């Protein structure tokens, strides 16, 4: 007989849910790591909708992720500006940055690094 260690989870039943203006962040704890799915509505901006509640001007969290839908801009404090689109896999270093949704479609992405500390009050 075989022992199984397979774990299945779904974001529609997250282990933790963080909410903020114009967005939600669903977290799953699985296999010793935290994976997050974030949904930002059109008009969302990190500095206004997350950072303001935390008393921060810029996001300080390092991210590794993949965009499921929508488009966002990441603006680094050093002046680098990048648009991130559906299907992109990205790395944002632990350097101050702001971000905002581009267009009228909600932005949805998966976070493989940085999820545990993102938007934590």
Q: How should each PLM-predicted stretch be described?
A:
Residues 33, 52-78:
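Glycine- and acidic-residue-biased ligand/ion/polar-headgroup-sensing regions
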Residues 37-59, 93-94:
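Conserved short histidine dyad/triad with adjacent acidic residue
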Residues 37-38, 91-92, 97-98, 103-121:
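A short hydrophobic beta-strand segment most commonly corresponding to one strand
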Residues 76-95:
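Short acidic-glycine-tyrosine-enriched beta hairpin
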């Amino acid at each position: 007989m075989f022992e199984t260690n397979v774990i299945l989870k779904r974001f529609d039943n997250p282990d933790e849910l963080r909410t903020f203006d114009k967005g939600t962040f669903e977290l799953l704890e699985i296999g010793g790591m935290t994976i997050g799915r974030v949904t930002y509505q059109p008009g969302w901006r990190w500095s206004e909708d997350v950072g303001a509640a935390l008393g921060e001007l810029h996001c300080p969290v390092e991210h590794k992720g993949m965009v499921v839908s929508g488009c966002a801009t990441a603006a680094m404090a050093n002046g680098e500006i990048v648009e991130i689109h559906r299907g992109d896999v990205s790395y944002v270093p632990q350097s101050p940055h702001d971000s905002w949704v581009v267009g009228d479609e909600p932005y949805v992405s998966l976070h493989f690094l940085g999820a545990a500390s993102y938007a934590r009050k």
